[in-house]
Amino acid sequence: MLTLKLFVYAVVVFFISLFIFGFLSNDPGRNPGRKE
């Protein structure tokens, strides 16, 4: 049961990361050397 819970958390974090990376990639003012 704990393994299933960790797996679900990992998938959720993975999708959130994809969403954030997609949002940043669509930002025309994106600069790899700048952190906001």
Swiss-Prot record:
Transmembrane segments: 4-24
InterPro entries: PSII_PsbI (IPR003686), PSII_PsbI_sf (IPR037271)
Disulfide bonds, paired cysteine numbers: none
Location(s) in or outside the cell: Plastid, Chloroplast thylakoid membrane
Membrane-topology annotation of the record: Single-pass membrane protein
GO biological process, one term: photosynthesis
GO cellular component: chloroplast thylakoid membrane; photosystem II reaction center
Keyword Manganese part of the UniProt annotation: no
Statement: the UniProt record of this protein carries the keyword Membrane: yes
Keywords per UniProt: Chloroplast, Membrane, Photosynthesis, Photosystem II, Plastid, Reaction center, Thylakoid, Transmembrane, Transmembrane helix
Pfam short name (any one): PsbI
Recorded family membership: Belongs to the PsbI family.
NCBIfam families: PRK02655.1
Function as written in the Swiss-Prot or TrEMBL entry: One of the components of the core complex of photosystem II (PSII), required for its stability and/or assembly. PSII is a light-driven water:plastoquinone oxidoreductase that uses light energy to abstract electrons from H(2)O, generating O(2) and a proton gradient subsequently used for ATP formation. It consists of a core antenna complex that captures photons, and an electron transfer chain that converts photonic excitation into a charge separation.
The protein's assembly and partners: PSII is composed of 1 copy each of membrane proteins PsbA, PsbB, PsbC, PsbD, PsbE, PsbF, PsbH, PsbI, PsbJ, PsbK, PsbL, PsbM, PsbT, PsbX, PsbY, PsbZ, Psb30/Ycf12, at least 3 peripheral proteins of the oxygen-evolving complex and a large number of cofactors. It forms dimeric complexes.
Protein name according to UniProt: Photosystem II reaction center protein I
Organism field: Pinus thunbergii (Japanese black pine)
